[in-house]
Amino acid sequence: MPRPSEPSPYVEFDRSQWRSLRMSTPLKLSEDELVRLRGMGEKLDLLEVEEVYLPLARLIHLQVAARQRLFATTAEFLGEPQQNPDRPVPFIIGVAGSVAVGKSTTARVLQALLARWEHHPRVDLVTTDGFLYPNAELARRNLMHRKGFPESYNRRALMRFVTAVKSGADEAAAPVYSHLLYDIVPGEYQIVRHPDILILEGLNVLQTGPALMVSDLFDFSVYVDARIEDIEQWYISRFLTMRSTAFADPASHFHSYSTLTDEQAVFAARDIWHSINRPNLIENILPTRPRATLVLRKDADHSINRLRLRKL
């Protein structure tokens, strides 16, 4: 529980303390399902789901119910009709963190667990990759070397999308990004129709600014954290694996990397990390960590053993 030191807006837990907060929340995820959710190079197992993600899912479940009661109270005060129980105000969750830290896996596991509660079965997951400017526009703006940095996103379009979902629009459309093509897919959209919960996953979702930002619309947020040196190693390992998987596809934007030797691939991955991903992490992503409701801290083996929950 809280360390007896200086006052902090957080409560810190080790894994043994956190897992006790699961209470009687049942595990409704099979090993086969977990394999499909697990990211490349990650070692997430059902024990970690039980000890880390089930307590988190329980906390979010409780907060969803509390938030709906708050909306009902506000509606009563304003003399407005009570909301349709089949169309609750969507609960928005942000999931942030570096490239290769495992935030996509965290988002997918949360989606799977939260959708198993009968009170909020409609859980949509959207990544901010779809709101990157198309490559042609990035090239026009001389931003191809800054892809993934805040300025490479159409932040107005992202804000319109999240606002539409939050305000109860019948449907909202998110552009689709192809990692194979390394570009937006023209004319293809992910349609979100009044979900109970929307999970928005991306590098910079917790950013702030002088104007309204998507993070201002979040009801809960998670930052997936690790030592920068560990994330670099995970990125390089993933890059090496992708030579024989995603990069091997002739249609891949990075197909030329598939023929690199181990030494060449490590050199290329390290160069990309130090020229793009590490600066983006240090300058833009890491500074948003204090805004997260919950920080999941990973060890070098990808396991989560420390957590920090914001209480204020």
UniProtKB/Swiss-Prot annotation:
Coiled coil: none annotated. One of its GO terms (cellular component) is cytoplasm. Its EC number is 2.7.1.33. GO terms for molecular function: ATP binding; pantothenate kinase activity. ATP binds at residues 97-104. GO terms for biological process: coenzyme A biosynthetic process. It is found in: Cytoplasm. Signal peptide: none annotated. SUPFAM superfamilies: P-loop containing nucleoside triphosphate hydrolases. Pathway: Cofactor biosynthesis; coenzyme A biosynthesis; CoA from (R)-pantothenate: step 1/5. It catalyses: (R)-pantothenate + ATP = (R)-4'-phosphopantothenate + ADP + H(+). Keywords: ATP-binding, Coenzyme A biosynthesis, Cytoplasm, Kinase, Nucleotide-binding, Transferase. PANTHER family: URIDINE KINASE. NCBIfam families: panK_bact (TIGR00554). Belongs to the prokaryotic pantothenate kinase family. HAMAP family: Pantothen_kinase_1 (MF_00215). This is Pantothenate kinase. It comes from Mycolicibacterium smegmatis (strain ATCC 700084 / mc(2)155).
